[in-house]
């Protein structure tokens, strides 16, 4: 909706049952109309920049989506009116945006309420010739536990030891359980 006028959205399985509020309300308030409130629907209109305000305990994906759209729509501030769920994933989004030339100002009050992210007017993504996408700690955790249970070592490649992904904590769980965790660059063996 930030770069084109009409978008058809469909979903299968359990996806149509996922909550889309407060995202739909905020998009409606910023120039987008929907043929209905659940998929399948057609989004019409271009998303406009401005101040977005949503509860943070429904989905961090709403915040990531608006952050990624913000450079295309102008100055935008996105504020969470409740503590932000899965904030590590929003941090991953803002770090990736920084890697591609967009600095996001993050304001975190002491209460974790009214946490705000601002993308300045005129910000734009820059292309990169090479970029390594770090591995997914959620998926890696399953295999690390399997290695611990079977006693058969496994090496998982492309992992960032210092990732902001919450599931990286599995490393400490493995160590606390007595497993050997050995790093070699971006590869981890359990």
Region roles according to the model:
Residues 1-190:
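Short, structured segments at the rim of ligand-binding sites
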């Amino acid at each position: 909706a930030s770069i084109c006028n009409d978008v058809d959205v469909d979903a299968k399985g359990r996806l149509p049952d996922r909550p889309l509020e407060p995202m739909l309300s905020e998009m409606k308030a910023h120039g987008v109309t929907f043929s209905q409130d659940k998929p399948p629907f057609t989004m019409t209109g271009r998303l406009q920049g401005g101040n977005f305000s949503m509860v943070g305990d429904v989905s961090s994906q709403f915040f990531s989506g608006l952050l990624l759209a913000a450079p295309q729509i102008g100055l935008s501030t996105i504020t969470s009116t409740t503590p932000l769920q899965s904030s590590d994933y929003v941090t991953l989004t803002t770090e990736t945006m920084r890697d591609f030339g967009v600095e996001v100002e993050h304001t975190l009050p002491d209460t974790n309420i009214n946490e705000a992210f601002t993308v300045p007017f005129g910000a734009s993504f820059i292309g990169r010739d090479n970029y390594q996408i770090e591995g997914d700690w959620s998926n890696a955790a399953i295999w690390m536990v399997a290695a611990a249970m079977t006693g058969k070592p496994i090496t998982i490649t492309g992992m960032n030891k210092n990732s902001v992904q919450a599931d990286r904590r599995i490393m400490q769980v493995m160590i606390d359980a007595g497993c050997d965790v050995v790093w070699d660059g971006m590869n981890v063996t359990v």
